[in-house]
Amino acid sequence: MPSFDVVSEVDMQELRNAVDQTQREIDTRYDFKGTAAAIELNEMELTLFGDAEFQVEQVMDILVQKIAKRGIDVGCLEPGKLEEGGGKARRVVKVLAGIETDTARKIVKLIKEAKLKVQAAIQGDKVRVTGKKRDDLQEVIALLRQADVGLPLQYNNFRD
């Protein structure tokens, strides 16, 4: 029986490249000369630094631009609140990867409400969709693309 997986993944190599490009642009831009503007990548967190709130926002804008250019969905970034103190500002941005249980349940519910002849099962941080016909699976993909689940979704491991 044909099946595919619904996942939410981020290509870490592309993310690292986008962060490096952002840091390179910060280093060369005239309006950032002599400031504490910087960006760091630790595991699944980005930390943006600046002298003031507007600088952190500018770093965020540059990052979003570079990430979009590299083909990563900007929806995978979850900005935290801005922390200011001691003449410096910083913001921690979480990188979302993997489908949480609540979101997975929402996806399964959406598929079941569509009354298509497919089964959806939660398997860890992904949702496996199985059906008898390939056309049904393609309808599920179209349905999920239209639905807003709060995460960028990818479809992989398509088996016939």
Swiss-Prot record:
A GO molecular function held by the record: nucleotide binding
Keyword Metal-binding: no
Keyword Metal-binding: no
InterPro entries (UniProt xref): DUF520, UPF0234-like_C, UPF0234_N, YajQ-like_sf
SUPFAM superfamilies associated with the record: YajQ-like
Gene Ontology, cellular component aspect: cytosol
Keywords noted in UniProt: Nucleotide-binding
Pfam families listed in its UniProt record: DUF520
CDD domains, sorted: YajQ_like
Function: Nucleotide-binding protein.
Family: Belongs to the YajQ family.
NCBIfam families to which the protein is assigned, alphabetical: PRK05412.1
Protein known as: Nucleotide-binding protein Tgr7_1196
Organism: Thioalkalivibrio sulfidiphilus (strain HL-EbGR7)
